[in-house]
């Protein structure tokens, strides 16, 4: 659902930032 998409988005951003 929307929450899953949001989590994926946050995970991708964290990955890019190297956090």
From Swiss-Prot:
Pfam family, one: Antimicrobial20
Keywords: Amphibian defense peptide, Secreted
Signal peptide (from-to): none
Tissues and organs where the protein is expressed, per its UniProt entry: Expressed by the skin dorsal glands.
Intracellular or extracellular location(s): Secreted
GO biological process entries: defense response
GO cellular component, as recorded: extracellular region
Protein name (database record): Uperin-2.7
Organism in which the protein naturally occurs: Uperoleia mjobergii (Mjoberg's toadlet)
């Amino acid at each position: 659902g929307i929450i899953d998409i949001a989590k994926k988005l946050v995970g991708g951003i964290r990955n890019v930032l190297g956090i």
